[in-house]
Amino acid sequence: GTMQYQKNLTLRDGTPCVLRNAGADDAEQVLRIFNLTHTQTEFLLTYPGESPMTVENERDFLAKSAASSNSIEICAVIGGEIVGTAGITLIGSQEKLRHRAEFGISIDRAYWGRGIGRALTEACIECAKTAGYTQLELDVVAENTAARMLYEHVGFTEYGRNPRGFRTRSGAWQELILMRLELD
C-alpha cells in the first residue's frame, strides 16, 4: 500500500509542529520551500534557478510520491505553513538495489536548530523501515557540521568520501561524505 505518515510533536521551544506526508495539494508550498532553502545555504545540490520544476511538475511528483509504496515526501508544518521537507526514494529498481533508499532533507533557515531536522530524519528512517528497506543512504558536504552531527546522532556512519563531489560556481571543490544506516 501507500506510505502514510502523520505525527504531532512539540518542539523544544514549545511550538507545535505537524509532520505528515506531502500530497499534490502541497505543491506550491513544497516548491516555495525548495526554492527558498536553496538560496540559504551552499550545501545543497542545486543552485537557485537551476531546477526547472513548475508547480505542475511538483504536483505530479507529489501525487506519484503519495501513491507510491517505496517513496515518501514528508513535510514539517508550523502554523499551517510548510517549513521543511525530507524524503526517501528508491536508489534503483533492480533486484540487487531494492534494499537501498536515498534520504534528502531541507529546512528553512529561520527554523534551524529547533529539532525539526531530527524529527524529519527520524520520520524518514521509520518510513524506510516500514517500506522494507534495509539501508538508508545520503551524502553530505564535509563542511556541513550541523547536518553531519545530526546524521551521526541518529546512527548514520561514514563509508567513504568524494573529495571532488561538488564543484561550486567559484570553482572550489566541496568534499562529499557518503553515509549509510543499516535498518535491519
What are these regions (language model features)?
Residues C17-Q29:
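A short beta-loop-alpha structural element at the N-terminal edge
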Residues R12, E50-A110, T121-E122, C127, ...:
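Acetyl-CoA-dependent GNAT
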Residues A24, R32-G49:
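Helix-loop element at the rim of GNAT/NAT acetyltransferase active sites that forms part
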Residues D26, G80, G115:
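Conserved G/P- and acidic residue-centered "switch" motifs that form tight phosphate/ATP-binding loops
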Residues E137-V140, E152, T157-Q174:
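Conserved catalytic-core motifs of GNAT/GCN5-like acyltransferases
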Residues G117, T121, E143-A147, R164-S170:
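Short glycine/proline-centered loop/turn elements that form peptide/ligand docking sites
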Residues G1-T15, S170-D184:
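Terminal substrate-recognition subdomain of acyl/acetyltransferases
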Residues T121, A128-D139:
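Conserved GNAT acetyl-CoA-binding A-motif
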